[in-house]
């Protein structure tokens, strides 16, 4: 059961999912920053768990540019909006989506969150990942079986 907190109208806009591996080079980090800055020049809404370090950096850039975001949670909704997200929330540029009612975050809930976020996105972007990453299965499945455009930031 999905639960929402924030501006649900963001779901009616063009959604771009962003997933980043926890392991990345400085070159990949620079490419992700460049991608985030380019996205800020569009009206696309970025959806992600914003959980990995690189995803958090992309979120920081999006918020700095006052760009709308959907924060996908693999756990229950926050009881209070985190301070770093409060302004975006107050300005209607933020939506939290909970795909699981669990109170604790886990690897499995992260995986489910990523699949659900990709499932509602109009386009999906990944940073490079190794073949053992949880992102590998998601990427392979979407690239092979989905009509959703899939990209890897090279």
Residues of each region from the PLM?
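Glycine-biased, small-residue-rich flexible motifs in mid-sequence functional cores and linkers
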Residues: 1-154
């Amino acid at each position: 059961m999905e639960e929402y907190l924030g501006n649900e109208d963001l779901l009616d806009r063009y959604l771009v999912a962003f997933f980043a591996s926890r392991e990345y080079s400085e070159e990949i980090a620079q490419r992700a920053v460049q991608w985030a800055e380019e996205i800020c020049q569009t009206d696309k809404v970025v959806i992600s768990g914003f959980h990995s370090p690189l995803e958090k950096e992309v979120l920081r850039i999006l918020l700095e540019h006052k760009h709308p975001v959907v924060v996908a949670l693999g756990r229950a909704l926050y009881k209070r909006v985190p301070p770093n997200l409060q302004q975006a929330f107050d300005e209607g540029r933020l939506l939290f989506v909970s795909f699981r009612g669990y109170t604790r975050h886990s690897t499995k809930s992260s995986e489910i969150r990523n699949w659900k976020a990709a499932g509602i996105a109009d386009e999906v972007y990944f940073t490079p990942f190794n073949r053992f990453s949880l992102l590998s299965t998601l990427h392979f499945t979407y690239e092979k079986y989905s009509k959703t455009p899939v990209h890897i930031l090279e």
